[in-house]
Amino acid sequence: MEARLQSEGRGFGALSILRCWLGAALRTALAAAAPDQTAREIENLSHFLKKQETLQRLARAFGYDASKVTLSPQTKTFDYLGQSFTSEGQSFANGCIEIYYDPQMSDARLGCCLAHELQHVRYFLVRDAYCAEPADGPLHRRFAKYAPEALAAQRGVSNYSNEHWDAWKGGAPPTLFSFELEEGGSEPINETIAEVAKALYNWGPDVRINPLWRELHDAINEEYTALHRG
């Protein structure tokens, strides 16, 4: 798979595939963390401390608990489809997010990475609520229109998300709020929605983007907000 992404309007240059997927199969492929002494040295660098402050500020600007977002001095890699990639960030089901320090990472790129990972956190929370309710529950009713065939027909909104569609190995198109990685070896829906969030952050609300994916992104965020209020 060619590692590529489109350039971003806020100076977010062309990227390799840098998303670290959740799931035990890929977690075991993560490289060992940098030695402790090296990590401590990095954490004391003035540039690292400045980026850490910027990340905390960005998290607060997103309305997110900054204590759950950390800048890690570690470098992590993962193998996917026979290639090795470096991860920019990782989100966890408990709402925590790690961004991996890169001295070359601009503030714009840092914000885009955080926007992408935060959307995964929102998706996970709504997915958990969806899976916990009965088949005729309110979330099932709201999201019924986003059938597998309808989403598959749209494909992704970026080269990166389209690579997830190309890599899908399931016997049928992926289903919204399913455990895609376990079922088909990639996460087309989850990653496409996260790429919508990144595009909206990067280009603003007037960005031209697939209307069905934009609608689904907005619906997930509305339900995420409602779940938090509840």
Model-derived regions, located:
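Non-Sec secretion/translocation targeting segments of pathogen effectors
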Residues: 1-7, 11-19, 24, 28-32, ...
